[in-house]
Regions:
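Gram-negative outer-membrane beta-barrel transporters
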Residues: 556-559, 676-678, 700-821, 906-908
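Acidic/polar loop-and-plug regions of large Gram-negative outer-membrane beta-barrel proteins
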Residues: 299, 307-376, 401-454, 517-530, ...
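Short acidic/polar hinge/loop motifs at secondary-structure boundaries
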Residues: 62-64, 166, 185-213, 232
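Short, acidic, small-residue-rich periplasmic hinge/interaction motif at the N-terminus
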Residues: 31, 35, 42-47, 74-81, ...
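Surface-exposed extracellular loop regions of Gram-negative outer-membrane beta-barrel proteins
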Residues: 572-579, 590, 604-657, 676-705, ...
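Conserved C-terminal beta-signal and adjacent last beta-strands/turns
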Residues: 6-8, 21, 313, 359-360, ...
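Transmembrane beta-barrel wall of Gram-negative outer-membrane proteins
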Residues: 241, 248-279, 284-322, 331, ...
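A beta-strand signature from Gram-negative outer-membrane beta-barrel systems
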Residues: 97-99, 200-245
Length: 909
């Protein structure tokens, strides 16, 4: 970059003064095409002349070009594709406005595996958010909040605890969305989902977020169905300096963050360090939280063409939750007003309470730390080839609280049952009476009837992703790579509190068969008196080993770009159970399966039609995915308690096609696309509420195989900045997501045992003749759980230097309630006819953000603030369909958050 600066300066000074009198001033601002952030250090040359300059730190440039001749402007910068603007005859001064530049796919300075697609070149639907947008919009919300204005994306906070948000994309839930950090997968290896509370600090270190909807173009061997979210962290080539920030918000929200960067030193070293702490009371009653986050990255240029980067990041946290099962009916929420003021009732938490000593108690606390360590080697083999290798290690520690009890009292831990408030242990003020639990256990002559356990989930996960990229010619680029992973997850429950009881007898021990574990042959085995620290319910390891290869060829000829990619992966999975099996029988059979993807697409870029910038593109892509079954709820139907492998487990198949059109100028971008996705042989589980013969409530599930669905829709988004002091961004997404076949489901209780009837009788085995099953007639029925129509429109105004004011409107509608089942639906060889679920009322939200940057004592300082749900709109964000398919029978209803406010001070140094 220094050489470019020197060259450009010499050329500019050498330009004859006499020519300046015969010249015109050309100026503009160069921005990143993906996030509209200004690019400093871009060399701007008037081709055929010696006129050149470079952009300043705000991306601005100004030069004087000779009048009278036709000239082209060339823009070049390390890490970006050279851009040439074909200009007409230069007759006078002109302002080009914003000039976008696209990032190159091979750049030594980018010491991360980005898996980014290039806008308007790669034929996929994508949206990129830069660090500025992330910082402006996140406020006090969870990290996924910033994706709400992305087409096809729906974000819900579920129970409302810290980091408990969930994302769906094009109607596909989190286990079908690939989440990557620097190109490394974050999805759980056993079931595919992501817990965002484990990554709550990513908003502080993210330089960009790119969502690729549909099959995408990410460089991994295992595919996504709904799309991918790739988070790229800040690299070590940041300039020297740092910042300190403090933020505060409603409900005791506080956040401290510091960042320090050395910049690139003369000997090739660079260090970037970030740390932060967040704490608060939580918007929902009794959901206080304490969280920390850290990011450490150090890199070294080993030689001219080699760079080694070590990165470690994590976000340890402790937060109390509101169970996802503890939503009420619509009327139930109105009745809660007897316990909480009118405006507060939607914050109610059915399991928040006190014990006899006046201590605050919870039954849904989550504690977790999932650090990830990455070591990356980037080798620029030549000007046309590079090898990028990342080895990583992830270690997970922690778990979540889970109340347990005898058959008569296990359901007493539930805050609600089928949307109805559980009154068994309810105080007059509506809080849960943990003191009554203590009294019950103290009086019991058979030990504690109700205890608290910690559901521990630990893992050891390591892997390697290596990608070789080669520019075969000016027209052909190829890449190929390997993706290797090894994972072991340990899961058990340990007693943490006897609630004043003398001991506890684990009812799950009665399910241990002597044929599998000889200890169960002892009549006293199931009556053993257990205490704090003892294991109950389950104790097993889930093993997943996966290896894959992937590759892509991209052909670029004039205005046509085409790509063909594929991947092949082999997954081997098994269980090792220490609770239900003795050592000689603890390890299950292993199950291996082969998965693959084939994707292809073309993009055509029409010639410039507006002289200096107007550009039309059209693209089409399609592909096929065959995905191996997940270990839980597919390969092992009773994954917590049994080594028995599902004999009917098959790969899921996905077929998708997509087409789109884009138009962009230096100041205006518009994207329009349509998609059609067929999903076959999906494995799916739904919750189940039953009542046993003794009248005790229980929660289980129905496991379905061979479910088919159709997801299709239209998406549009625009980004317009006509003048430097005003910009507008909007999107619209219309989906049509339906089930396309009738599925067969088998029933299990909360202990993972197959059920024979609606009263809790245990079947003789999985898929045995007496195993209760049911045909679910759902063909043609709308899928629930996500808004099928979303829209947003955001305005940002810069009324004076340093001041920013933003207003965002968001609309959500066509949200159909999800479904679960109850014991009244359960019958051997029965049929359940589904109808169109209840459509939740549409709602609109408005968010306000503002910031002012100024100089304070020589330090760049920013004061910013956010107001979410500015007008305090009441709305339903999540619901399950009831028997009447209406608001009166809908249950597990959650209302969204009311008005949230925050303010932050950030000082750069």
């Amino acid at each position: 970059m220094n050489k470019q600066f020197l060259l450009a300066s010499i050329v500019a000074v050498a330009t004859p003064v006499s020519a300046m009198a015969q010249s015109a001033v050309i100026k503009g601002t160069v921005v990143d095409s993906q996030n509209n952030e200004p690019i400093a250090g871009v060399t701007v040359v008037v081709q055929g002349t010696k006129v050149a300059t470079i952009t300043d730190e705000n991306g601005k440039f100004s030069l004087k070009a000779p009048k009278g001749a036709k000239q082209n402007l060339q823009f070049s910068c390390v890490g970006y594709e050279t851009q040439t603007l074909a200009g007409g005859q230069i007759s006078g001064d002109r302002d080009l406005g914003f000039v976008p530049m696209s990032q190159t796919s091979v750049a030594l300075k980018d010491a991360v595996v980005t898996t980014r697609a290039v806008a308007r070149k790669t034929p996929v639907a994508l949206t990129t958010l830069g660090s500025v947008v992330i910082e402006e919009k996140v406020g006090t919300a969870d990290f996924p909040k910033v994706l709400e204005s992305t087409p096809g994306v729906y974000v819900t906070r579920e129970g409302g605890g810290y980091g408990d948000s969930k994302i769906s994309m094009r109607g596909f839930k989190s286990e079908n969305i690939a989440v990557l950090v620097n190109g490394v997968s974050m999805n759980d290896m056993e079931w595919g989902g992501v817990y965002w509370s484990n990554w709550a600090g990513l908003s502080d270190v993210a330089s960009s977020i790119q969502t690729q909807r549909g099959l995408g173009a990410a460089k991994v061997s295992t595919p996504s169905v709904g799309g991918s979210v790739n988070i790229v962290t800040k690299s070590t080539d940041a300039k020297k300096g740092g910042y300190f920030s403090y933020g505060m918000g409603n409900d005791g929200y506080n956040k401290l963050t510091f960042n320090l960067s050395t910049g690139r030193t003369k000997n090739g070293w660079a260090l970037n360090l970030l740390g932060g702490r967040t704490w608060g009371d939580g918007y929902i009653q009794g959901t206080d939280f304490r969280a920390w986050n850290y990011f450490f990255s150090v890199s070294k240029e080993l030689a001219k063409n080699h760079m080694l980067t070590f990165t470690a990041f994590g976000a340890p946290q402790v937060h109390n939750k509101r169970s996802n099962y503890d939503g009420l009916t619509v009327q139930g929420w109105q009745d809660v007003q007897q316990y909480m003021p009118y405006k507060e009732k939607y914050r109610y938490n059915a399991t928040f309470g006190y014990d006899n000593q006046g201590r605050v108690r919870h039954s849904a606390q989550n504690v977790y730390h999932k650090p990830q360590i990455q070591l990356q080697h980037l080798w620029q083999i030549s000007n046309t080839a590079s090898l990028n290798t990342v080895a990583y290690l992830s270690l997970g520690y922690g778990g979540g609280e889970s109340g347990m009890g005898t058959a008569a009292y296990n359901s007493s831990w539930y805050g609600t049952n089928n949307g109805v408030l559980n009154m068994s242990f309810r105080r007059a003020d509506g809080t849960f009476d943990y003191g009554k639990v203590q009294d019950l256990n103290e009086k019991s002559e058979s030990g504690s009837q109700m205890v608290m356990t910690m559901s521990n989930n630990q893992h050891r996960w390591y892997g390697l992703v290596s990608t070789f990229t080669k520019e075969m010619s000016e027209r052909l680029n190829v890449y190929a790579g390997v993706d290797l992973r090894s994972y072991v997850g340990t899961h058990n429950n340990r007693i943490t509190d006897l609630f004043n009881g003398a001991y506890y007898i684990d009812s799950y021990r009665a399910n241990v068969k002597a044929a599998n574990n000889s200890a169960a042959a002892d009549p006293l085995f199931k009556y053993q008196k257990l205490s704090v620290g003892d294991i109950v319910r389950r104790d097993y390891d889930g093993h997943v080993n996966q290896g894959g290869v992937f590759g892509q060829a991209e052909y670029d000829y004039n205005n046509l770009t085409a790509f063909l990619s594929g991947s092949l992966s082999y997954t081997n999975q098994w269980r090792y159970d220490r609770f239900y099996y003795e050592k000689s029988k603890a390890e299950s059979e292993s199950h291996g399966s082969l998965g693959f993807t084939v994707k292809g697409g073309v993009n055509y870029k029409f010639p410039h039609i507006d002289g200096w910038g107007g550009q039309h593109n059209v693209f089409v892509n399609g592909g096929v995915i065959s995905r191996s079954p997940y270990l839980l709820s597919s390969l092992f139907l009773s994954g917590d308690v049994s080594n028995e492998i599902n004999p009917n487990a098959v790969n899921e198949k996905i077929y998708s096609v997509e087409a789109g059109w884009t138009y962009h100028t230096a100041s205006f971008n518009f994207n329009l696309n349509a998609y059609h996705t067929i999903w076959q042989d999906k494995a799916m589980a739904r919750s189940l509420d039953i009542t046993d013969a003794a009248g005790n409530a229980d929660r289980g599930l129905i496991n379905m195989q061979g479910v088919n669905s159709l997801h299709q829709g239209i998406e549009a988004e625009l980004d317009y900045k006509p003048v430097k002091w005003f910009s507008v961004r909007g999107m619209l997404s219309l989906g049509n997501w339906i089930w396309t076949n009738n599925a067969v489901g088998y029933f299990y209780n909360s202990q993972g045992q197959p059920l024979a009837d609606a009263k809790g009788k245990i079947a003789s085995g999985i898929y045995a003749d007496d195993h209760a099953k049911m045909t679910l007639n759902q063909k043609g029925v709308k899928e629930g759980g996500s808004a099928q129509f979303t829209a947003s429109l955001g305005f940002t105004v810069y009324p004076m230097e340093g001041l920013r004011i933003g207003l965002d409107w968001k609309h959500f509608s066509n949200y159909y309630a999800d479904y679960s089942l109850s014991g009244r639906d359960l019958s051997i060889n029965g049929v359940k006819n589904f109808e169109t679920p209840w459509k939740v009322p549409a709602y609109n939200l408005v968010d306000l953000s503002a910031g002012y940057t100024f100089n304070m004592g020589g330090y760049k300082t920013t004061i910013s603030g956010n107001v979410e749900n500015l007008f305090d709109q009441e709305y339903i964000s999540q619901a399950y369909d009831g028997a009447g398919h209406d608001w009166q029978t809908a249950y597990r209803v959650f209302y969204g958050f009311g008005r949230q406010m925050s303010i932050k001070l950030k000082v750069n140094f």
